[in-house]
Amino acid sequence: MNTDKNLEHLVDRAERIGVVGSPSSTTAVTLDILAPAVNKKLVGELALFRFLQDELMHYALGQIVEVTMRNVWHEDPTMLSLIRQRGRVDPVSERQDTHQGEMTISAVFAAKGRQYRPSILGTVPATGTPIHLVSDEVLSELLSPYQEEIFYLGRVYGSKPLLPLWFKHFGSGPKGAGEAYHLGIFGKTGSGKSVLAKMILLAYARYPEMALLVLDPQGEFAKEARGDSVSGQFKLPMREILNHLQKPVKVYEVKNLILDRWELFAQILYESPFFEHLSIPKGENRQLAAEILAEKLKDKRIPLRDLYLKEKFDIAWHLLGKEDIQKVFYRSGEARARFQSMYEKANVDEFFTKYWLPVTQLFREDRRGAQKIESLLKEIFHLDQERRPLVVVDLSGEGADHALEKIDEVTLFSPEESPQSQPQSAPLFWNETIQLLILKRLLDGIRREAERAYKQNRSLNTLVLIDEAHRLAPREEPDNEEKKALRSILIDAARTTRKYGLGWLFISQTLSSLHREIIEQLRIFFFGFGLGMGTEFRALSELVGGRSKALELYQLFRDPHSSFDTASREYSFMTIGPVSPLSFAGTPLFFNAFNNPEEFRKANPLKSKEGILDQT
């Protein structure tokens, strides 16, 4: 055995900062700080002490959450009078100061040979027991059997050692958790949420048997997955690392998604300006008009994929001119007469190009690189693939603002039609409601695939990341039916999909505005800067419970953007849950996330099934 790697020897060599003081308990240990360590930064440091329990040597680790100083002589009324006169009293001031810290125990290991097993602090060690600072060497020795599973997102808060974390896939086996769990990342804009989420995605991307799906309302993850340059100081080469891991990556934009439901067609047509230019404002009448038109077109066995053709539009236009159809959405003769007047005056070709095509292109199947939502989901959840993919669905709508690529005119027109005066491309219709409808369609499909796999006794082993979760599943009642339906699906998914091997990673700017039922289902939390005041802090306090010292330490986090330059920014996080081998007691841990991509890559020699693929 190499004595340099012997834990006893490593602890002896570690810096001693204090001893166990009084009072102490099995949850919090008082630290009497030694004179040489008084001027060191100790808050946030990871510390360790040895003690004997059940005839086995144990090692207890925890973070120092508070340091206090007391001088009883300075509290004496007579001394206070002297201090007021002189400022200090040499025999008393400074020399009689006593410094104490509070150490919250997060993990305890029992040593048996070179095997270290999780244990508990079942007794309080004697006063005077030495307490040492933890080093990377000590952690490596303690966690040596699990070194391949360890992943690093940053360093211990305000310190140098790397904080070991682990992200296991949701399947069975030696590196699997055996079940899915849900994660949440919370913090203000600029707190480092997105960068942390990308690093976590890369941690899960190491597993070929695990699929990853990112629902991206802002388009940020899509840019990273494509390898495009992104704004910000932390430029993580995500696509390059994924290629090293041999993880298949696919990015789908709005123009790549083929919608495949008649109810979606009716809802999107309702949202579009189509009926508005026929004098039907938003409301019940327009909804009835969209629904009856979709129903009649479906009755005529017109495939959704062909609705963009001019001849199919002509059928739809003809249907709207029929009185029995108009009576469905306008009961009064006066209203029908007004509609008929607008209908007869309308420029049919303009309606086709400006208002019909942008909607119906969403359902067109021969768009270059396009795929049905149903096919996309089957690709993600195909469990027998040797390497399951990371799929990003870009719902930002950036691609929808531009015209589609020029397409073969024979696909737009029937042979007997002359295409000379007709458009050969059209922008896609897009707004926030369409985004919600597509998200709802995706979530419905995910839930069905999960239920199907569960009936076959198979685990999906999939993580779904969803950004802007506070907007999609708010605590307050949404103001329209689409938002209500989407929120309901997300709440149900958080409650039920874990048993299917389907986990969720929710990213939110706020904690108090995300629906309580989703928060209650989360197992792992990451809290960045920005939740230290008002309703956010109250919501955070409810989750952390009675750990007031941990909350006080969280409130010390500084705004990353208050730094003098980008290189010195600190992205601090508090984490709760079974995400670290140093926190099986559920105690909060604090760390500073990497602010340099090279540091991240150096700390994590990313591995896949075949071994180490990236050591740079």
Task: Describe every region a protein language model picked out.
Residues A426-L551:
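Conserved P-loop NTPase motor cores
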